[in-house]
């Protein structure tokens, strides 16, 4: 079992906090930091540049204990897992890399496919000599987590996917693609828009993440999106459209949760039931009042489910459960 280090922790940090004290050494004035940056500073987060497979990635870390390796969504960064820092006080270490071309990591030398990014996460786990890892993937990060768990399960203890479909692109007979009405033509138009007007495209995308308006969280998400390299983002998006995890899911044996937002406008909430049907040791949970970012919009409920999974495996009886998140 990983050794847990004693620590003195600040107050529980939620995604909607506004008055957090930065740790020593932060150079930005408090009012200029996003709510995510404030949380990482308050929990004395470390930000380490690591070279893995010829790529240099920024890896955000805080705490000590059972490792939670958190893989961010498309156009985002590792700091988006700030609401999970509260789990440090439950004996966990949060490890949240910025994938190449996102957050504080430079663009990749190779095409950023889902498979290539999964290899980088595997190399990160190996380089840090981690064991009993709970892998957490948000959106695109879930695709990466599924592929890694199916192809490189060593060192993994559990897996959590956040509001994602195993097949994003539309396909005859497939009921769970990204946003009903999407076509091959709209996919091409989206990629073109990313390359020509990244900020404009991000503004439209960010409007679809949260179920309810929250300026502080949206500003924090926008700051992360603004750091992304548009060409990397467009290539990753194309890979996401081509990727199909349906063959991966039956190969994943670790205990797993598929957590979805009941008000997500990106994916139908019923996709969680399909994921749990395909994955032998998975349970789907729908947090009724949240959108595409359950870990940010309902951190207490999300963290409680993650804690139960990481310590005891998935709760047994029902395949899919709807929960009203407070």
Label the predicted regions.
Residues 116-133:
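Conserved acidic catalytic loop of the alpha/beta-hydrolase fold
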């Amino acid at each position: 079992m990983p050794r847990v280090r004693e620590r003195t922790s600040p107050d529980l940090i939620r995604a909607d906090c506004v008055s957090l004290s930065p740790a020593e050494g932060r150079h930005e004035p408090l009012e200029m930091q996003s709510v995510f940056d404030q949380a990482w500073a308050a929990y004395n987060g470390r930000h380490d540049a690591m070279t893995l497979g010829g790529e240099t990635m920024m890896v955000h870390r805080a705490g000590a204990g059972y490792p939670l390796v958190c893989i961010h969504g498309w156009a985002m960064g590792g700091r988006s897992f700030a609401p999970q820092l509260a789990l440090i006080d439950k004996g966990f270490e949060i490890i949240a890399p910025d994938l190449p071309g996102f957050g504080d990591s430079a663009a990749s030398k190779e095409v950023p496919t889902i498979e290539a990014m999964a290899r980088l996460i595997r190399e990160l786990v190996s380089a840090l000599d981690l064991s009993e890892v709970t892998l957490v993937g948000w959106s695109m990060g879930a695709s990466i987590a599924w592929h890694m768990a199916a192809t490189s399960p060593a060192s993994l203890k559990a897996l959590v996917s956040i509001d994602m479909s195993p097949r994003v692109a539309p396909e005859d007979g497939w009921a769970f693609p990204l946003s009903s009405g999407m076509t091959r033509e709209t996919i091409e138009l989206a990629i073109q828009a990313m390359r020509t007007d990244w900020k404009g495209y991000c503004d439209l995308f960010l409007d679809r993440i949260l179920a309810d308006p929250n300026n502080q969280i949206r500003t924090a998400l926008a700051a992360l999106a603004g750091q992304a390299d548009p060409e990397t983002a467009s290539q990753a998006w194309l890979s996401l459209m081509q990727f199909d995890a349906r063959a991966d899911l039956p190969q994943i044996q670790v205990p797993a949760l598929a957590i979805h937002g009941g008000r997500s406008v990106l994916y139908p909430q019923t996709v969680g039931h399909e994921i749990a049907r395909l994955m032998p040791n998975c349970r789907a949970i729908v947090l009724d009042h949240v959108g595409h970012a359950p870990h940010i919009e309902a951190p207490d409920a999300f963290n409680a489910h993650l804690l139960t999974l990481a310590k005891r495996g998935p709760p047994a009886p029902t395949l899919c459960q709807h929960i009203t998140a407070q």
